[in-house]
């Protein structure tokens, strides 16, 4: 049984977090972001009942998978550091605590639901390709889910709610799509078309290893674009 002091501390903490949640930093269709009770951190709290990835008995809460994927990106310097995950009975109110990066990062673009373009899009797709090589597929990269370093323009990826692990042909396709979209953003549409078609032809023929070889060669070229 928890000691009375622990229960009181937990109650007071939830009261502070509830007050912070009433003044959110940002809201989306599936979550709300607000200041943590720990200075320098923020909370991302799901606004739906988290019944796991597939909603089956015994499924781990989806928030755990999301935090694990974000942690991979954070280790690569592409996402905020994950400080912790909290889950609650019935999957209601599950949340991720992470570093608040707003002091050094900013949004780009006039339309929150628009997508990165030009150099920003090249850099975002370079990161998506690096994540693909780590076996991570990250989607939903609209302007509200990407911040940029105020000094260097380096992207910082937010929101790993629409993401997953990939391997085999799916990993190749994920890498190829990120690379092709990066080429297109750099104004190399013809290169993107030929590259994508080549990789997909190999995949359709069952040549996964050769397709990955070509995908990596193209991505290496994308990485050289500044």
Task: Map each language-model feature to its residues.
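Conserved structural core of kinase catalytic domains
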Residues: 71, 77-122
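Protein kinase-like catalytic core scaffold
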Residues: 41, 78, 96, 154-156
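C-lobe/activation-segment region of protein kinase-like
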Residues: 136, 149-226
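Catalytic-loop of the protein kinase fold
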Residues: 133-143
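Active-site beta-strand termini and strand-to-loop segments that position acidic
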Residues: 35-39, 100, 149
């Amino acid at each position: 049984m928890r000691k009375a002091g622990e229960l009181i501390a937990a109650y007071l903490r939830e009261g502070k977090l509830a007050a912070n949640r009433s003044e959110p930093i940002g809201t989306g269709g599936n979550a709300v972001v607000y200041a943590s009770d720990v200075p320098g951190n923020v909370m991302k709290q799901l606004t739906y009942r988290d019944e796991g990835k597939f909603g089956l008995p015994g499924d781990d809460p989806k928030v755990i998978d999301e935090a694990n994927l974000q942690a991979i990106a954070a280790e690569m310097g592409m996402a905020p550091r994950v400080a912790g995950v909290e889950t609650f009975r019935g999957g209601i109110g599950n949340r991720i605590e992470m570093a608040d990066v707003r002091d050094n990062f900013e949004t780009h673009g006039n339309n929150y639901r628009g997508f990165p373009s030009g150099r920003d899009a090249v850099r975002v797709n370079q990161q998506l390709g690096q994540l693909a090589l780590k076996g991570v597929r990250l989607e939903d990269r609209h302007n509200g889910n990407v911040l940029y370093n105020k000094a260097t323009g380096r992207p910082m990826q937010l929101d790993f709610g629409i993401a997953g692990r990939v391997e085999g042909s799916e990993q190749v396709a994920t890498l190829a799509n990120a690379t092709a979209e990066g080429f297109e953003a750099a104004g190399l549409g013809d290169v993107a078309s030929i590259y994508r078609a080549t990789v997909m032809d190999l995949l359709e023929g069952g040549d996964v290893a050769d397709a990955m070889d070509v995908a990596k060669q193209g991505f290496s070229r994308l990485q050289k674009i500044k």
